[in-house]
């Protein structure tokens, strides 16, 4: 969805098993976006697939990193001798975030803390997700070229509120006196 927003020197990590999916078959793309993207790909002589979108990002100077998320889960399931893990596609988000942190060389401790916090009442689920996170993080640090970016850790100041975009918008509207949002 955000391929056109990736800047030069940007980074794309994507699931290689999705390369041949047509834009029209991506269920998370709304119809207007599909039409725009299909036209954009056609005007740039690219395939009407995820592969075409990734090629455009690459041509604009983005660093492209392809990995099969399913293969990562399969390798992890073999390593942990837990065949159930290889079919847990809901772990793809954890894999994606962990691959990103590994590529950017951002310490993974905060991710581990977050996963343990989110699944604090489900210890076995937390352990599986932490294993997946560490596995993907280590994969990225071993397999992806160092991109040369350095991030410094910042302390979160007291009274700092971290919210997702739609929460921030809602809070802003309430503070501004808006009484109805549709």
Q: At which residue positions do the language-model features occur?
A:
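Active-site cofactor/cluster-binding pocket
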Residues: 1-180
